[in-house]
Amino acid sequence: MARNDIRPIIKLKSTAGTGYTYVTRKNKRNNPDRITLKKFDPIVRKHVEFREER
């Protein structure tokens, strides 16, 4: 298997509507569903939920 098949690069987009994104890798075997993480959005200066964008 290729490196990108197991751990592809994904974008995490802010739910605050600012358009701010984080880029990370995800293990498809352990997390087949979409990821949601609480991270800092510097545009609104708060911790908000970021969801995986496909």
Curated annotation (Swiss-Prot):
Any Gene Ontology biological process: translation
GO cellular component terms, A-Z: cytosolic large ribosomal subunit
Domain of life: Bacteria
Molecular function as annotated in GO: structural constituent of ribosome
Keywords assigned by UniProt, alphabetized: Ribonucleoprotein, Ribosomal protein
InterPro entries cross-referenced by the UniProt entry: Ribosomal_bL33, Ribosomal_bL33_CS, Ribosomal_bL33_sf, Ribosomal_zn-bd
Annotated Pfam families: Ribosomal_L33
Family label: Belongs to the bacterial ribosomal protein bL33 family.
Listed NCBIfam families: PRK00595.1, rpmG_bact
Matching HAMAP family: Ribosomal_bL33 (MF_00294)
Protein name per UniProt: Large ribosomal subunit protein bL33
Phylogenetic classification of the source organism: Bacteria, Bacillati, Actinomycetota, Actinomycetes, Mycobacteriales
The encoding gene: rpmG
